[in-house]
């Protein structure tokens, strides 16, 4: 089976969030048994092409977007995946000077790329074309209007339903879409507005989200009734599939960044397992200037953004100070107000023996925190899937979560973690923290059972890939 994914980020090349990681994991698992290709834009300032001798092909092609255009497709293989990067030769201003993936004119940029990608797919042929989020939503309409050879199915995965790609009809008219297909993207209430996600929903053969609970949640999203109508119309061709994590990349067995490696098998003698985590904790605390006197260690490894529940993060700081345990927060702030608030907290708690706030992100430090911490707190307002809780469980770090989206699907309260539900109830959140800390301190048998359940949780990529293959073959 030949599968082509189209997206605007892919973790080995460039990423801004979970989409890039999820696509990488899925493509890697599929590539083990199927011809798998990922098509993304080339961002020259953000990624350097492999040397020419390492490329498997360089193709020139034409596409239509605001007139006849030309592009170059550079292809190479990465871990069995064919990666194709598009340089828009006659529209260089769209990507060549971009210093971030996302800019203010994303709809136009991504539609131009989608037009080039669709032209390439029509030329190359594929059995399955798999789109990721609204960014490449135009590809669905273009391939429905003019299918490629051997095309069996167009699949759309919604990594974050909150972003829809609102744009103008004028931008859709710049493509080769005819009036019928433009109407699939058009809003009835405002014919001059088109929504790339809306058209992709109608033009795709199957729609997936990244967790079963999130699939249910988006059917109850009435923030735009026309988008609600579109997703409701596809509900019988909608399925939630949990993302997986690459256990060859994430795991304490061979992670070179840890002070002490450890394995799930060590848990046959729990004291040896916890001694290994304690060695990692000691090394981390020395690095961060924290006191070893107070346990447990709770961490938050997250973007500090409204989606991630920053109001609960502040409550966690207070709770840690009041109950004498360690809290480590690491993540980049999104938004000036949040940055100011957390920068002030960082400064005021700089000498605290128990709380450390790091307004940055380091992959190495994150791994050391996963290994050292006893619990990881993820109080998201919404979470389509979430990988952090799965990574935490791989390291024997117990998740404390809000029961939403993929967090609800992966964490069972009192079994392999702790959870709360109300997105605005500080009392319920603090009760969850108290229950987790008390269990750690006073009920060692139950704590060991919870950690064991975390280590036994299956989050491998192959499980997710097999579920996608079922959809491809339907």
UniProtKB/Swiss-Prot annotation:
<dbReference type="Pfam" id="PF00534">
    <property type="entry name" value="Glycos_transf_1"/>
</dbReference>
<comment type="function">
    <text>Synthesizes alpha-1,4-glucan chains using ADP-glucose.</text>
</comment>
<dbReference type="GO" id="GO:0009011">
    <property type="term" value="F:alpha-1,4-glucan glucosyltransferase (ADP-glucose donor) activity"/>
</dbReference>
<protein>
    <recommendedName>
        <fullName>Glycogen synthase</fullName>
        <ecNumber>2.4.1.21</ecNumber>
    </recommendedName>
</protein>
<keyword id="KW-0808">Transferase</keyword>
<keyword id="KW-0328">Glycosyltransferase</keyword>
<keyword id="KW-0320">Glycogen biosynthesis</keyword>
<dbReference type="GO" id="GO:0004373">
    <property type="term" value="F:alpha-1,4-glucan glucosyltransferase (UDP-glucose donor) activity"/>
</dbReference>
<dbReference type="InterPro" id="IPR001296">
    <property type="entry name" value="Glyco_trans_1"/>
</dbReference>
<dbReference type="Pfam" id="PF08323">
    <property type="entry name" value="Glyco_transf_5"/>
</dbReference>
<dbReference type="InterPro" id="IPR013534">
    <property type="entry name" value="Starch_synth_cat_dom"/>
</dbReference>
<dbReference type="GO" id="GO:0005978">
    <property type="term" value="P:glycogen biosynthetic process"/>
</dbReference>
<dbReference type="InterPro" id="IPR011835">
    <property type="entry name" value="GS/SS"/>
</dbReference>
<comment type="similarity">
    <text>Belongs to the glycosyltransferase 1 family. Bacterial/plant glycogen synthase subfamily.</text>
</comment>
<comment type="pathway">
    <text>Glycan biosynthesis; glycogen biosynthesis.</text>
</comment>
<feature type="binding site">
    <location>
        <position position="15"/>
    </location>
    <ligand>
        <name>ADP-alpha-D-glucose</name>
    </ligand>
</feature>
